[in-house]
Amino acid sequence: MSSNDPGQPEYLGSDAVPDEPKGPRRGRRTGVVVGVAVATVAAVGAGAYGVAQLMAGGESPASAVPAGAIAYVSVDLDPSAGQKIEAIEILRKFPSLRSELDISSRDDLRRTVFESIQKSGDCKSLDYADDVEPWIGNRVALAALPATEGSADEKVKPLLALQVSDQDEARTGIRAIQKCAGDDEKLGIAASGDYVLLSEKQADADAMATAAESAALADDADFTKWMDRTGDSGIITMYAAKEAAGIAVDLAGQTDRDSGDLEPGSSGSRRGKQVEAALRGFEGAAGVIRFNDGAVEAEFSSKGLSKGMGGADGEQGPDVATLPATTAAVLSVALQDGWLDEGMETFRSMMGEDFDASLARAEQRTGLKLPEDVETLLGDGLSISVDSSLDVEGLKRSPDPRKVPAGIRITGDAAEITAVIDKLKAAAGPQADVVQVRSKGDVVSVGLDKAYVDTLLESGDLGDSAAFSTVIPEAGRASAVLFVDFDAGNGWAERLAAGQDPEAKADVKPLDALGVSSWEDGDQVQHAMLRLTTD
């Protein structure tokens, strides 16, 4: 992947802006800012899928946002002509989307979205051609900047950066939208290059424009570092600075305090403590959604997030690439030592004394030692897979679980794992005899279809398939994988959809493969990717 251009759109930042003198809170104004943001993002987002004019130009919203923003998200209609073509070609493959978005036309979908909002009853007095089209641009970003120290009533200040072609027309149009929404309070509006900046107060908007002129987010070292880590630019870009963790903890705590969901016997917030634990080492994050080489792709990177069940220190998960080439779907995850401890503490904090009592009853019923036997059972990691030879119609006619080619492959101490399985089968009684268990080396396979369970012990060549390698690019070091091959076994997905309505069947036909994976690189940066390819 090529490195990302720092001038591309992104998410939220951290340069403080001055407060106005304290006065009455203006919650309604916050609603208008958010409302305008949502409407604009919706319009631009829809346009990103359908606009067919391929000229690009202008700077990204990050050039109009002050450096150090703590969070930022942007939508870009002009990432590149290539991505626009990819988006149109991919979405045209799905009949329902082609019909819904009218992708075959060259209409301005921003008009379509605006007029659909009007149909809901808002701003019917406005005309798109007269009040919006003359000034609206192709890029927009929503950002959060930290409030100045000592501001008791707010932690962040919202900022909407909207690309415009005419500053005066934009101000007039925005005021008209605000008026038709029934808000008499004036939004803060300021100019910053090709953008208008909207915030709750005029002083904030002016200060943000001045700050961006002095130091823009697009040139911020942390911002560009995270954009580089996330790969090529795209239509939607997201960014969270290190400082965003503290805001997230505060918001989670405030939510609990508002709802009364506090730690028993204390004023501490349960959710706040959980979020704080998850973000304790957080150093930043970024994400991009793009259209690339016939695929829809979302890529994310972060550092310092709690890894929970994911592989720690670059730990690789089970070798999914050695599953049978006929695999239709698989979910795989690596489990680090002590992975269950965090979950146990969470449940204990939620259930209190009832948790330990429930655990004791479960031990008595199953003969297991909990939670130790659960960790032993799942080993170092496991994969759950189903083969494309699954005969759905046959099962409908004659249900027999022994003919379901699905199973679990566990990696770890085979003797210890099978011992726990034996305990579970003994507790379940004779009906558990249908469960097939096999082991070979450090692999244990479990399922109902004897032939498939045996197959799971062999080394397959799923990793050699183009469908797999295209959507799981880092299979060799992935700690978690979800893979679906829609074309496996002569198109099992189409066969499954055969009984659905014609449009649903037609929408399944273009699907090729879906991959979701996560891994950690040598710098301990955590990566995640979702990729959906089409035929």
How does the language model describe each region?
Residues S3, G23-V156, V164, R175-G182, ...:
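Structural boundary/hinge residues at secondary-structure and domain interfaces
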Residues L456, G460-D535:
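Long, C-terminal catalytic modules of enzymes
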Residues L198-S199, A298-F300, V443-L448, Q526-L532:
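Generic recognition of long tandem-repeat/solenoid scaffolds
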Residues S3-N4, Y72-V73, Q118-G234, P371, ...:
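Single conserved position on a long alpha-helix in the C-terminal lobe of the eukaryotic protein kinase
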Residues E363-K369, D373-E375, I417-P430, N490-A506:
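Beta-propeller and related beta-repeat scaffolds in trafficking/envelope systems
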Residues M1-R29:
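Terminal targeting segments of Actinobacterial cell-envelope proteins
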Residues F300-S302, V333-L335, G412, S439, ...:
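Active-site proximal loops enriched in glycine and acidic residues that flank catalytic Cys/His/Asp
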